Amino acid sequence: MTESEKKQQKPQKAKAEKFKALSAPKGVPDYVPPTSAEFKAVKDAFTSAAHAAGYEHVELPIFEETSLFARGVGESTDVVSKEMYTFADRGGRSVTLRPEGTAGVMRAVIEHNLDRGQLPVKLVYNGPFFRYERPQAGRYRQLQQVGVEAIGVDDPALDAEVIALAHRCFSSIGLNGFRLELTSLGDWDDRPAYRQKLQDFLATLPLDEETQRRAQLNPLRVLDDKRPEMQEMLAEAPLMLDHLSDSSREHFETVTGLLDDLGVGYTINPRMVRGLDYYTKTCFEFVHDGLGAQSGIGGGGRYDGLMAQLGGQDLSGIGFGLGVDRALLALEAEEKRASTGRRVDVYGVALGAEAKRRMVGIVDDLRERGVSADMSYGNRGLKGAMKGADRAGALYALVLGDKELAEGTVTVKDLGAHEQHEVDLAAVVELLAEKTADRTAHA
């Protein structure tokens, strides 16, 4: 056998196949530590403020029948006509990833007869929503929102409550540089005369074909056109605020008066038109100039008639959606961070195999007592393990090695006071449960 043949007989080492690293789809953000803690803190702050105002949590599907949004949001809107993720499921049904929250909440209220009980029905929800938009700073294809809906009562005091609640949500995370813009879109009886005047005005403008189509379907949608050249042409357009009925005007004046009483500042923006067709009467938006062109951080309004349009009772409602992603960007623009608190109360450092076995039990007992606890894994030394305690933001570190095991003790380090004490191993769980409870109570 030749040398060449011998080489060929030798088993060849299999080459490890190199896979291309995957990334998230375009326009879909990841939230990983430490940003994920800030994301959760903002979402929790918004939700807690709503719970404190009597709103109950509701959990809804990520996708719905497409017809829900076509009927509820409006077929002439950009959301329905251009931005929805719509597909046929395996049964041939057209379904859509939810682009907004109100229509789904209303569907659930009708389906589960929540409107047959105590009114108003006050609900809060949170989670991801989906719109196929051109990704840019502050505008994602998967956006995160917290929203509330108050359904069943046509009362301007409820409008004021909802707006003040949204204002409180942003204040609760330390945001300062936001503004509230407010208007009234009138009721359905106010619309026909105004619609005709607006269409007459639009007919005098050199509109492109798509905008002409929109002007015929729903002329208010034209006012939502953000192109600078369109905004210039629309400068002299008739205003809905000038065409309100007496009852709609009284409703709006009551809302603004209540906001004045509550100390909630606002600017009346008569040209505001939100991108959803169901809004009536009170309509509002919170903006932050630190976000540039995508300045909206949340908004909402009243939607009288939506429930009937979706097959339910003819009950009114009002709500808002606040952007968690946008709020984080607004905090960043103010050079602030959402307050996240510490990850754990106690961090265990075990030096040696037997110490690790004992530390696993101590950490589990602490968790059983309601104390948040973690420990060092792998074979890091004391210095490396203590870095883990610092990164976790722990109040206390427990150090357990051969010396402590032999003496039946454990070293408890108070990381805030920079003090340490030897504590009986059998008593350490009880001691730390008491200490962390006291620290939490006085935080």
From Swiss-Prot:
Protein's name according to its UniProt entry: Histidine--tRNA ligase
Main location: cytoplasm
EC numbers, comma separated: 6.1.1.21
Record InterPro entries: aa-tRNA-synth_II, aa-tRNA-synth_II/BPL/LPL, Anticodon-bd, Anticodon-bd_dom_sf, His-tRNA-ligase, HisRS-like_core, HisRS/HisZ, HisRS_anticodon
Species of origin: Corynebacterium jeikeium (strain K411)
Entry GO terms, CC: cytoplasm
Keyword ATP-binding included in the entry's annotation: yes
Family annotation (HAMAP family): His_tRNA_synth (MF_00127)
